[in-house]
Amino acid sequence: DDNGKPYVLPSVRTCGFDFTGAVEDISK
């Protein structure tokens, strides 16, 4: 992702860790 979020959480999008959009991805 490219929204500049500094979170490091599991993300389905990256099949691992998404450093810049995990919160938004999870909330969807």
UniProtKB/Swiss-Prot annotation:
Catalytic activity, as annotated: L-aspartate + 2-oxoglutarate = oxaloacetate + L-glutamate
Signal peptide start and end residues: none
Required cofactor names: pyridoxal 5'-phosphate
GO cellular component, one term: mitochondrion
Subcellular location field: Mitochondrion matrix
Alphabetically ordered keywords of this record: Aminotransferase, Mitochondrion, Pyridoxal phosphate, Transferase
Family, similarity comment: Belongs to the class-I pyridoxal-phosphate-dependent aminotransferase family.
Record's function text: Plays a key role in amino acid metabolism. Important for metabolite exchange between mitochondria and cytosol.
Additional facts recorded: In eukaryotes there are cytoplasmic, mitochondrial and chloroplastic isozymes.
This protein's name: Aspartate aminotransferase, mitochondrial
